[in-house]
Amino acid sequence: MKLFPVAIAIFYRWLPTQKLEVWVQKRVDDGPFHGLLEFPGGGVEAHEVPLQAVVREVDEEVGILVDPGLATQMGIYPNEMPNRTVLLYVFLFPEHSELNTKGQWLEIEQTQLSAPYKGQIPGPNHLIIDDLFRHLYDNQHE
């Protein structure tokens, strides 16, 4: 099966109320995730490494330049599709002041995690959001 690398950016903020907020935007292309709320990102081109791709994609999709030095790679999440395996390279970025008008913040609580957004976000993003919440929550309680 063909491997298709994709780099995504998660802008997040951890609130004093022990809640996580992640920034998403509505997908407008005609692909399988049309109309869903998704993280900025896209395919890694042949001449790029995933970090370069995520910086380029954020610029293309959101119109802001992010400092690659602020990125933290969270992990790689495989997603099986009918004709390929998508490898999601997930990069975390701190909140950026220019995001507020170009998308929306989703609030994630410990009791439900990403479950309230079922049908509103792509399936693979549930695992990513839930893992991110657990990681940040555990770091706050060490």
Feature-to-residue mapping (PLM):
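Active-site-adjacent beta-strand/loop module that shapes the phosphate/pyrophosphate-binding cleft
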Residues: F4, G75-Q104, I108-E109, L132-R134
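Generic structural "secondary-structure junction" signal
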Residues: F39-G41, A46, N79, T101, ...
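A short coil-to-beta-strand element that immediately follows conserved catalytic motifs
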Residues: L65-G75
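Nudix hydrolase/Nudix homology domain
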Residues: H34, N100-E142
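Conserved N-terminal beta-strand and adjoining loop/helix that marks the start
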Residues: M1-V22, L92
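Non-catalytic surface loops within mature trypsin-like serine protease
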Residues: R13, P68, F93-S97, Q110, ...
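Conserved Nudix-box catalytic region and its N-terminal flanking loop in Nudix hydrolases
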Residues: K19-E60
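Short, solvent-exposed loop/turn segments that connect beta-strands within catalytic domains
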Residues: W14-E21, P32-F33, P82-R84, L99
